[in-house]
């Protein structure tokens, strides 16, 4: 069915692509990634767009003091929209291309932001956040795949990790905007903050006219000339004879030939015997990322710091520091993910996060006292103001937890889920499925965390600590290493059922040509093709004579 849809829309898709190509393109891979990963910045704007306001008096008064259940649904409504957006993304991305999907992402985001900025009641706020969420869902499913398809293999991890960096940058920018605008009395504070969300959406929308289409998608549409030109301009300043370019084109051809010779690919294919292990690995990678508890820190940090004894501006300032930590620590992570590998970072990160979750639970459990008159039923405990050391210990656990996440699971999962398939035929749909799992867990965590704080307070962190232990165990036994491996190697590793803990040192049973060997082979084939074309042209001229 999916292949039929792609064939039906192939003509219109190429016309749309021609229209998008009217403006000159920029082929610097970092510029391209910076435009596409604005979708990640929008994801970040979503995460912190509520954080600075949920404890503010004017917010509580305007929305009639929403209880833990209502506030949970308001916060989580964007994740609900993102779930549906991520599922729908492949129905646009496959037949119409990656750029149109990013344009769709920007459109929904801007419409949702406009609705939020003109909010009159809770229902309108929820509707606006759901619509923006659809856009974020499109972007979170498409942008990592688009980056992986365009990036040279040697910096694939870096380019893939830029998505998470832009997420953290968006979180920080939005929180500080909200913090500054929070000094305005009345509803203008959050109206302006939510209206400013239109800016990154507009930048993404306009930027899509200056970046090229995915060469793999173009090749699939039979546009080989355009595909080769894009690969050459990105990897070799336009030199089509460059070995890296020849290797990349060869890999694309091999993948498409394999796709032509196989049965139709759809969502059901992901759950066949060949792919089901990869599918569940990618799904659990996204599930575990949410179950670290990171978004509890992002969405409800103001609540957490109230429990630690902070209030007013001191709460917001202390809260903002973790967003700076999140952004700054992500930068070296982009480098180390290609040096250290995926597995060591994920296992080490889960272990550290477990320790800090248990540490935070222990401090709050030991030193907090009941706080029945807090004015917020989600915050019913508090460390006394005279116990500064306990407060600082709780805050330190939060900061160290955020740093541990940013350096490991924050960057690592988006890179890993784009690589793990080892087969471009299923990568887009697989990424859409795994990303939808991320969003449904995001929704559940944002929805039920206030209720968890209300009913079990500090014990909530014990639950997330246990999840961190479980994910470290799962990564060790179930997540193979993908660092430095070509798509064919990753696919072969799955087919040979290599144990995850042996994947780092694994060598292909069926030898795969080295880059140098493949380059020599491609050069020979390229010369043979040129000679055949010359012979064909000579015969044609002789016949005409």
Swiss-Prot record:
The chain crosses the membrane at residues 29-49, 72-92, 100-120, 125-145, 157-177, 192-212, 291-311, 317-337, 345-365, 395-415, 433-453, 460-480. SUPFAM superfamilies: MFS general substrate transporter. GO terms for molecular function: carbohydrate:proton symporter activity; D-glucose transmembrane transporter activity. Pfam families: Sugar_tr (PF00083). Its main location: membrane. GO terms for cellular component: extracellular vesicle; membrane; plasma membrane. The keyword Nucleus does not apply. It comes from the Eukaryota. Induction: Expressed in presence of 2 percent glucose. Expression is induced by progesterone and drugs such as cycloheximide, benomyl and chloramphenicol. It is a multi-pass membrane protein. Glycans are attached at residues 376, 387, 455. Disruption phenotype: Reduces the binding of human FH and C4Bp as well as of human immunodeficiency virus (HIV) gp160 protein onto C.albicans cell surface. Reduces ability to form hyphae. GO terms for biological process: carbohydrate transport; cellular response to heat; cellular response to neutral pH; D-glucose transmembrane transport; filamentous growth; filamentous growth of a population of unicellular organisms in response to heat; filamentous growth of a population of unicellular organisms in response to neutral pH; negative regulation of complement activation. Interacts with the human complement factors FH and C4BP. Also binds human immunodeficiency virus (HIV) protein gp160. High-affinity glucose transporter. Acts as a multifunctional complement-evasion molecule that causes down-regulation of complement activation by acquisition of human complement factors FH and C4BP. Also functions as a human immunodeficiency virus (HIV) receptor via binding the viral gp160 protein. Modulates hyphae formation. This is High-affinity glucose transporter 1. It comes from Candida albicans (strain SC5314 / ATCC MYA-2876) (Yeast). The lineage of its organism: Eukaryota, Fungi, Dikarya, Ascomycota, Saccharomycotina. The gene is HGT1.
């Amino acid at each position: 069915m999916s292949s039929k849809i792609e064939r039906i829309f192939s003509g219109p898709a190429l016309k749309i692509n021609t229209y998008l190509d009217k403006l000159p393109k920029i082929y610097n891979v970092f510029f391209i990634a910076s435009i596409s990963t604005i979708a990640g910045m929008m994801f970040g704007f979503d995460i912190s767009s509520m954080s600075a306001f949920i404890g503010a008096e004017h917010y509580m008064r305007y929305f009639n003091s929403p209880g833990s259940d209502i506030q949970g649904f308001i916060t989580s409504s964007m994740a609900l929209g993102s779930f549906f957006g991520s599922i729908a993304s492949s129905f646009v991305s496959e037949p119409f291309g990656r750029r149109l999907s990013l344009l769709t992402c920007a459109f929904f985001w801007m419409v949702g932001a406009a609705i939020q900025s003109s909010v009159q009641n809770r229902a309108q706020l929820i509707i606006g956040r759901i619509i923006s969420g659809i856009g974020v869902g499109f972007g979170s499913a498409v942008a990592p795949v688009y980056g992986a398809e365009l990036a040279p293999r040697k910096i694939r991890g870096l380019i893939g990790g830029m998505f998470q960096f832009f997420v953290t940058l968006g979180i920080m920018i939005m929180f500080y905007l909200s913090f500054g605008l929070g000094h305005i009395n009345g509803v203008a504070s959050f109206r302006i903050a939510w209206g400013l969300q239109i800016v990154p959406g507009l930048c993404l929308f306009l930027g899509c006219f200056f970046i090229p289409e995915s060469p793999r998608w173009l090749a699939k549409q039979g546009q080989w000339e355009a595909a080769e030109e894009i690969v050459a301009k990105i990897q070799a300043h336009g030199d089509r004879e460059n070995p890296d370019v020849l290797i990349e084109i060869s890999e694309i051809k091999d993948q498409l030939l394999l796709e032509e010779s196989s049965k139709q690919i759809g969502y059901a294919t992901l759950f066949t015997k060949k792919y089901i292990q990869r599918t569940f690995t990618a799904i659990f990678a996204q599930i575990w990322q949410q179950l670290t508890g990171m978004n509890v820190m992002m969405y409800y940090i103001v609540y957490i710091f109230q429990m630690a004894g902070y209030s007013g501006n001191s709460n917001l300032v202390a809260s903002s520091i973790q967003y700076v930590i999140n952004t700054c620590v992500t930068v070296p992570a982009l480098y180390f993910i290609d040096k250290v590998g995926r597995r060591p970072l994920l296992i080490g990160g889960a272990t550290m996060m477990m320790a800090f979750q248990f540490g935070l639970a222990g401090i709050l459990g030991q030193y907090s006292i009941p706080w029945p008159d807090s004015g917020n039923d989600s915050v019913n405990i508090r460390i006394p103001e005279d116990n500064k050391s306990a407060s600082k210990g709780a805050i330190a656990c939060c900061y160290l937890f955020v740093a541990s996440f940013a350096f490991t699971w924050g960057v690592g999962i988006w890179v890993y889920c784009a690589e793990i398939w080892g087969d471009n035929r299923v990568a887009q749909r697989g990424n859409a499925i795994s990303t939808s799992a991320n969003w449904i867990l995001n929704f559940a965590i944002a929805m039920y965390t206030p209720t968890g704080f209300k009913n079990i307070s500090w014990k909530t962190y014990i639950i997330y600590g246990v999840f961190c232990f479980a994910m470290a165990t799962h990564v060790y036994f179930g997540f193979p290493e993908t660092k430095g491996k070509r798509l064919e190697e990753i696919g072969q590793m799955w087919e040979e059922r290599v144990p995850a803990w042996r994947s780092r040192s694994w060598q292909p049973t069926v030898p795969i040509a080295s880059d140098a060997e493949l380059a020599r082979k491609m050069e020979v084939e390229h010369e043979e093709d040129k000679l055949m074309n010359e012979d064909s042209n000579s015969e044609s001229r002789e016949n005409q004579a």
